[in-house]
UniProtKB/Swiss-Prot annotation:
Protein known as: Pesticidal crystal protein Cry7Ab
Family: Belongs to the delta endotoxin family.
A Pfam entry, by short name: Cry1Ac_D5
Biological role: Promotes colloidosmotic lysis by binding to the midgut epithelial cells of Coleoptera.
Molecular function via GO: signaling receptor binding; toxin activity
SUPFAM superfamilies: delta-Endotoxin (insectocide), middle domain, delta-Endotoxin (insectocide), N-terminal domain, Galactose-binding domain-like
A GO biological process held by the record: sporulation resulting in formation of a cellular spore
Keyword Metal-binding among UniProt keywords: no
Length: 1138
């Protein structure tokens, strides 16, 4: 069983360290053989490393500084701030000693590296200067707070702020001199703490000090930059120092652990509160908790021989727990064993702590969990439970002891005194040895009395073994401690921000885990597992249940998705989140910039005093890592939500306009104007009637400005395909919607199409008269969702984007009001959370998951005669396509300059050259086509065809006409192109020729335009399209096609057929009257084709004269074998020949 399985513990008989094998200890020297016990103890005590009794001034000072800092987090009030400065200066710059020098010395001792004297002296001198100026600033600040309207106090505090700030900016690099970053690290962290506290004052008081808003913003942005910079520096060099001390022996681990413990106290604890100096994020007093765990030294006398004892890695893996949820010690069950003395004349027997197991609770939980056994229970002589239930153990006094043998020593702990706020608990194997090991030497209190000013509480005990050659392993306990701020209850206050670390959960999701934190978060992190459920926190609400709270979560991830907060198993908050980094590693490797905040716009009230808070993820973009640092509760007043709506709307309205409110900002879209109007609509008219009315007038004015700058006609889609307005033209498959959750006004719904030649489309041409030369215009709009939606803007050429946008703006269950109408106010939070056009991604020419879109078009010179204009087109050409979009606009973006100007001039020149080439080409085709058409008709009025005109000749003329390019736009075949007038003129003459051809033809459906209609056919006959013509196909020798027609007797007719034979055999067309008079046309594959008579390769036209003797005649089409294709069969009077 894993003792750090955070989902819950079980009782276990697991014994730690029973199988460790260590090298046999070397025999003691003869002088030690003859030494008595007290002499031996004197030697072992002299062998203790210098840092053993580390209850020194440096550590004492930093725990006091940390305590003072924790009490002044956020914006606690003016008196707290001045008292903070007063206390800090007293701690860091006392009159009787140089604390900063002791900071350096403490770390120098731990890492055995001295700071070069010049760098040391320079840093100390500059620190002295900072202290002097901080004292002056503190006094100036206090004077101003007492006399805020006095110009003299204002001037003085401003001057002292700027001087002190400049000194910090100048001196901070001296506290990170290259090569000495680690021994200077405590100095750096403490100085950074003061600088960030100072910069907070600029944001808090800058407006009262008459700083410009730019100056306040500059200082605030500098503070945010320094929070990140200082945090990352502290963690980087802490890790560097720790890795430097990595070793292989027990003694090396002792020093390694001391460095870790003391640098957590001196550096990382302070770095953990840096973010809370941000007065905009933490705008009131803030309660936070340091949940990291530190380990005091093993309770043991020094090992006399380095060859015995566990290795470095064994110590780290055995004594140090893996990351876990915060737990609280409830009971130690301790086993006592005995070492028999070598001689009672020298020393007594040792009754020692040989094994134990730990029972504990997690935050605000009654369930008790018990670990397996640490140590060895075999041969124990007694055991007992030592209860600490609800009793913070803030200090331990222990009696480490040793039994001396001629060739070995056996170590053990005879007794431990546990000091608790509710009383003491005493473990006593015996009482023959003194209580010499005091935990407050390593974890000092923040003053006297200790039971009130203690800084840490005992939370757990592990154990290690020291090997002897002849005896079983001795068990040495190691105590772990949490900071006092990590209290058992997760109290949520009515008057300050509560920051609850995620590791204060009492239950994790099945696959969620606790991972090592990066160092600047004050503890470890919770990492999500394979599903969305992260875990549960129990809280205690120390406020009336009517109190409202804002909620935010600090997290790090490279995925996007939705973060859900449940209270008492009821979903209460939902919000989309974006990735904070592109790539992410393990929790310990994260930097300050890896983290972001999910902040909910909706406030909450707790349903009871002890709610269960569940954190849950959904809609994740992939299965990557997600880390939770903390969840925060910010108390707000009862009208906070309405006030927030008002302030949000006011800010949104102000951002719509340029200075003077004469125009809209360039980046303001028509969609944004609509969304701002929704914000205004959501303002409470009861609480803020005047403000709402004023904002409504402004947003209506903004909408008028939006209409006025939009070059598109009919932006609300009221007159599509109107003959009265030259606006939008569209196909079938378009529906106009009105007023839903996303769009306030009209919007478009496109459906897919069954035929790519006839897409669903909507287009409009912007007239040249509306445009300015050498100007850029932008097409903008908003898409709720789409697939295969193509957007075009066209002038010299077409700019084209395919827009695929996920339907991810709103939850599955949409909020509605009591009338069943869209509740836009409730839905607004979902729209706020979704990405804008800047968050889009382009792949293979497809713009994905960007709800806002924009396409540029640059204009060159203006020519009103050409009226090139700008074409705007939307279309869907697939069956699966769909789109829901609106707020379309084309607006002026600004002049085209620089490279863009050169590019548009080049485009225009290229377009004009192509147009000239097209004009020349078209003129030549027009001449040919006109001549071909003139040859078809018998007169200038095109009222009769010449008698010898064949179908092939008409089709040939049509082919010439169809070779005219740019008759229709390439991007949409229904939109006329530059050659449309010419093409139309010629096409109408072609159609006239076909009409006359059909009129004179006695054979019904002789061109098979209506398939097999009017023909009697066998089942294997078909009609297929070929090169724009319908062709009759006979595939078998027994296929037969028949038609009876009625003619004039004694009149002459011409039978004219255009056909093609494929393969052997022949095809034929026979005409027979009722008296048996028959004529026949035959076609074979080997006939020589008259090029002048051919239309398509292989097709030829033949004709013959026929004089019927009866009115009724019979026409038959057939073949002997192979394939026979008939394009046209014509029978007409030959009266024109007479």
């Amino acid at each position: 069983m894993n003792l750090n399985n955070l989902g819950g513990y079980e009782d276990s008989n697991r014994t730690l360290n029973n199988s460790l094998n260590y090298p046999t200890q070397k025999a003691l020297s003869p002088s030690l053989k003859n030494m008595n016990y007290q002499d031996f103890l004197s030697i072992t005590e002299r062998e203790q490393p210098e840092a053993l009794a580390s209850g020194n001034t440096a550590i004492n000072t930093v725990v006091s500084v940390t305590g003072a800092t924790l009490s002044a987090l956020g914006v606690p009030g003016a008196s707290f701030i001045t008292n903070f400065y007063l206390k800090i200066t007293g701690l860091l710059w006392p009159h009787d000693k140089n604390i900063w020098d002791e900071f350096m010395t403490e770390v120098e001792t731990l890492i055995e590296q001295k700071i070069e004297q010049y760098a040391r002296n320079k840093a100390l001198a500059e620190l002295e200067g900072l202290g002097n100026n901080l004292t002056i600033y503190q006094q100036a600040l206090e004077d101003w707070l007492n006399n805020p309207d006095d110009p003299a106090t204002i001037t003085r505090v401003i001057d002292r702020f700027r001087i002190l700030d400049a000194l910090f900016e100048s001196y901070m690099p001296s506290f990170r001199v290259a090569g000495y970053e680690i021994p200077l690290l405590t100095v750096y962290a403490q100085a950074a703490n003061l600088h960030l506290a100072l910069l907070r004052d600029s944001t808090l008081y800058g407006d009262k000090w008459e700083f410009t808003q730019n100056n306040i913003e500059e200082n605030y942005n500098r503070q945010k930059k320094h929070i990140s910079e200082y945090s990352n520096h502290c963690v980087k060099w802490y890790n560097s120092g720790l890795s430097r001390l990595n070793g292989s022996t027990y003694e090396q681990w002792i020093n390694y652990n001391r460095f870790r413990r003391e640098m957590i106290l001196m550096v990382l604890d302070i770095a953990a509160v840096f973010p809370i100096y941000d007065p905009r994020m933490y705008s009131m007093e803030t309660s936070t908790q340091l949940t990291r765990e530190v380990y005091t030294d093993p309770i043991s006398l020094s090992i006399s021989n380095p060859g015995i004892g566990p290795s470095f890695s064994q110590m780290e893996n055995t004594a140090i727990r893996t990351p876990h949820l915060v737990d609280y010690l409830d009971e130690l069950y301790i086993y006592t064993s005995k070492y028999k003395a070598f001689s009672h004349e020298i020393q007594p027997d040792l009754f020692y702590w040989s094994a134990h197991k730990v029972s504990f609770k997690q935050s605000e939980q009654s369930n008790l969990y018990t670990t397996g056994i640490y140590g060895k229970t075999s041969g124990y002589i007694s055991s007992g439970a030592y209860s600490f239930r609800g009793n913070d153990i803030y200090r331990t006094l222990a009696a480490p002891s040793v039994v001396v043998y001629p060739y070995t020593q056996n170590y053990g702990v005879e007794q431990v005194e546990f000091y608790g706020v509710k009383g003491h608990v005493h473990y006593r194997g015996d009482n023959k040895y003194d209580l010499t090991y005091d935990s407050i030497d390593q974890l000092p209190p923040d003053g006297e009395p200790i039971h009130e000013k203690y800084t840490h509480r005992l939370c757990h005990a592990t154990a290690i073994s020291k090997s002897t050659p002849d005896y079983d392993n001795a068990t040495i306990p190691i105590f772990s401690w949490t900071h006092r701020s990590a209290e058992y209850y997760n109290r949520i206050y009515p008057n300050k921000i509560t920051k609850i670390p995620a590791v204060k959960m009492y239950k994790l999701g099945d696959t969620s885990t606790v991972v090592k934190g990066p160092g600047f978060t004050g503890g470890d992190l919770v990492k999500r597992g394979s599903n969305g459920y992260i875990g549960d926190i129990k809280a205690t609400v120390n406020s009336p249940l009517s109190q409202n709270y804002r909620v935010r979560v600090r997290y790090a991830t490279n995925v996007s998705g939705q973060f859900n907060v449940y209270i008492n198993d009821k979903i209460t908050l939902q919000r989309k989140f974006q990735n904070t980094v592109e790539t992410i590693g393990e929790g310990k490797d994260l930097t300050y910039g890896s983290f972001g905040y999910i902040e909910y716009s909706t406030t909450i009230q707790f349903p009871d005093k002890h709610p269960k808070i569940t954190l849950h993820l959904s809609d994740l973009s992939n299965n990557s890592s997600f880390y939770v640092d903390s969840i925060e509760f910010i108390p707000v007043d009862v009208n906070y939500d309405e006030k927030e709506k008002l302030e949000k709307a006011q800010k949104a309205v102000n951002t719509l306009f340029t200075e003077g409110r004469n125009a809209l900002q360039k980046d303001v879209t028509d969609y944004k104007v609509d969304q701002v109007s929704i914000l205004v609509d959501c303002i409470s008219g009861d609480l803020y009637p005047n403000e709402k009315r004023e904002l409504q007038n402004l947003v209506k004015y903004a909408k008028r400005l939006s209409y006025s700058r939009n070059l598109l006609l009919d932006p609300t889609f009221d007159s599509i395909n109107s003959s009265e307005e030259n606006g939008w033209y569209g196909s079938n498959g378009i529906v106009i919607g009105n007023g839903d959750f996303v769009f306030k006004g009209n919007y478009l719904i496109f459906s897919g199409t069954n035929d790519t030649q006839y897409p669903t489309y909507l287009y409009q041409k912007i007239d040249e008269s509306k445009l300015k030369e050498y100007t850029r215009y932008k097409l903008k709009g908003f898409i709720e969702s789409s697939q295969d939606l193509e957007a075009y803007v066209i002038r010299y050429d077409a700019k084209h984007r395919t827009l695929d946008v996920s339907d991810n703006l709103l939850p599955d269950i949409l909020p509605e009001n009591t009338c069943g109408e869209p509740n836009r106010c409730a839905a607004q939070q979902y729209l706020d959370e979704n990405p804008s056009s800047e968050c889009s991604s382009m792949q293979d020419g497809i713009l994905s998951d960007s709800h806002s879109f924009s396409l540029n078009i640059d204009i060159g010179s203006i020519n009103h005669n050409e009226n090139l204009g700008i074409w705007v087109l939307f279309k869907i050409s697939t069956l699966e396509g769909y789109a829901k979009f609106g707020n379309l606009e084309v607006i002026e973006d600004g002049p085209v300059i620089g490279e863009a100007l050169a590019r548009v001039k080049r485009q225009e020149t290229k377009w004009r050259n192509k147009l000239a080439q097209l004009t020349t080409e078209t003129q030549a085709i027009y001449t040919r086509a006109k001549q071909a058409l003139d040859n078809l008709f018998a007169n200038a009025q095109d009222s009769h065809l010449k008698i010898d005109v064949t179908f092939a000749e008409i089709a040939a003329a049509r082919k010439i006409v169809q070779s005219i390019r740019e008759a229709y736009m390439s991007w949409l075949s229904v939109v006329p192109g530059v050659n449309h007038p010419i093409f139309t003129e010629l096409s109408e003459r072609v159609q006239r020729a076909f009409q006359l051809y059909d009129v004179r033809n006695v054979v019904r459906n002789g061109r098979f335009l209506n398939g097999l209609s009017d023909w009697i056919v066998t089942s294997d006959v078909k009609v297929q399209e070929e090169n724009g013509n319908n062709v009759l196909v006979l595939n078998n020798w027994d296929a037969q096609v028949l038609q009876n027609v009625k003619l004039y007797q004694d009149r002459g007719y011409i039978l004219r057929v255009t056909a093609r034979k494929i393969g052997i055999g022949e095809g034929y067309i026979t005409i027979t009257d009722e008296e048996g008079h028959t004529v026949q046309l035959r076609f074979t594959a080997c006939e020589v084709i008259d090029a002048s008579n051919a239309f398509i390769s292989g097709y030829i036209t033949k004709e013959l004269e026929f004089f019927p003797d009866t009115e009724k005649v019979h026409i038959e089409i057939g073949e002997t074998e192979g394939i026979f294709l008939v394009e046209s069969i014509e029978l007409f009077l030959m009266e024109e020949l007479c």
